[in-house]
Design a protein with these regions (language model features):
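Conserved SAM-binding strand-loop segment of SAM-dependent methyltransferases
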Residues: 1-2
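A conserved structural/catalytic subdomain of Rossmann-like adenosyl-cofactor enzymes
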Residues: 5-8, 12-205
Length: 205
């Protein structure tokens, strides 16, 4: 429906899990961020919008998606993004995140957003069952809420607070800098991964 008509319904909260991986240059309206923009345009000024989308949609990997991100910031405000457990949609292969926006208020250049790594959410995959809750899940959820609502501070490996650009990848992994000195095993593994990558690139020509 037309966003202006939907806005007349005076919705103050919007939530969405849009279709995944349908967008293309031929069908830019089917990109996840296009659905997000339409939802934001359909809400009243100051409304809160929460969407669960693939992490890849936060990167602006195509010109069309980059343009959508730029346009969203011209008219709406990004509050933050929470990176989720890779097995949230177990068996699907999509790594999701939750993005939170405020509708109808252009994103200020000095706005500080939160980017949270919630991949370790207290849920694990059980054989033949799927994703199950562990004993730590409730405490981890409470910790997430406490950090999001500024009740407590968190280490940057969990939450990075920063200003953003439309050209950024709106993900914790983009803004986080790990200044911890790696262990010898971590160093060896990283070098091994890099050499494997280089070898595969050479073999592919």
């Amino acid at each position: 429906q037309d966003a202006n008509k939907l806005q007349l319904k005076q919705a103050t909260v919007g939530m969405m899990n849009p279709p995944y991986s349908q967008g293309s240059k031929q069908n830019p309206d089917l990109y996840e961020m296009s659905f997000v923009e339409h939802l934001l345009d359909s809400l009243v000024t100051g409304a809160r919008c929460i969407v669960i989308v693939p992490q890849s949609s936060m990167t602006g990997k195509t010109k069309e998606e980059q343009s959508l991100k730029e346009n969203i910031l011209k008219h709406h405000t990004l509050e933050g993004v929470i990176s989720l457990n890779k097995d949230t949609f177990y068996g699907v292969g999509t790594i999701p995140c939750i993005a939170v926006f405020t509708a109808g208020e252009p994103h200020p250049a000095d706005k500080v957003c939160k980017f949270i790594n919630f991949e370790n959410d207290g849920y694990k995959v059980a054989p033949h069952i799927g994703l199950i809750e562990t004993e730590s899940a409730k405490d981890k959820k409470q910790h997430l809420l406490d950090v999001w609502f500024d009740r407590i501070e968190a280490e940057t490996k969990f939450c990075v607070e920063t200003t953003i650009e439309a050209t950024d990848e709106w993900l914790h992994s983009f803004y986080y800098f790990n200044d911890a000195i790696p262990t010898e095993d971590e160093f060896i593994k990283t070098i091994g991964d890099y050499l494997t990558f280089e070898f595969s690139m050479i073999m592919q020509g």
